[in-house]
Amino acid sequence: MENNKILGINHLLFSVSDLSVSISFYEKVFDAKWLVKAEKTAYFDLNGIWLAFNEEKDIKRQEIHDSYTHIAFSIQQEDLPFWEKKLHDLGVNVLKGRKRHEGDRDSIYFSDPDGHKFELHTGSVFDRLQYYQNEKPHLSFHEGHIKALYDRNK
């Protein structure tokens, strides 16, 4: 293994206003498995991703709704109807997606009880790069970095 390299995402931590509400949301929506719960913190396993929550009741949360910042999880195209139904049945706040070209692939956007945004996306970075290279040649592409990314994921 090479030294001095980022190895991947270690964990995702969210500030939440009500720990018990967030625990219920992530268990029901994502089928996340809780590992440890305390008075103001909880750790979950989400299919190998370490999720952490810290309850912070007095944080202003209104501004988060104006941002496009989000976390996207990959899903299969054929699973899109399942997720649409599940989110609807659970009463999850599903957000209006942005207009997109079919080359961007399909997505569902939604938020948790504190306004953290998520996307369930059917494409990959490789799909997006191919679409951009074919349809948006005016963009700048770093061919060396793109090749290295492809090579790492063969």
UniProtKB/Swiss-Prot annotation:
Residues 8-123 form the VOC domain. CDD domains: FosB (cd08363). GO terms for biological process: response to antibiotic. It is found in: Cytoplasm. SUPFAM superfamilies: Glyoxalase/Bleomycin resistance protein/Dihydroxybiphenyl dioxygenase. Keywords: Antibiotic resistance, Cytoplasm, Magnesium, Metal-binding, Transferase. InterPro entries: Fosfomycin_Res_Enzymes, Glyas_Bleomycin-R_OHBP_Dase, Glyas_Fos-R_dOase_dom, Metallothiol_Trafse_FosB, VOC. GO terms for molecular function: magnesium ion binding; transferase activity, transferring alkyl or aryl (other than methyl) groups. Mg(2+) binds at H11, H70, E119. Its main location: cytoplasm. GO terms for cellular component: cytoplasm. The active site is at E119. Its EC number is 2.5.1.-. Its cofactor is Mg(2+). It holds the Pfam family Glyoxalase. Metallothiol transferase which confers resistance to fosfomycin by catalyzing the addition of a thiol cofactor to fosfomycin. L-cysteine is probably the physiological thiol donor. Homodimer. Belongs to the fosfomycin resistance protein family. FosB subfamily. This is Metallothiol transferase FosB.
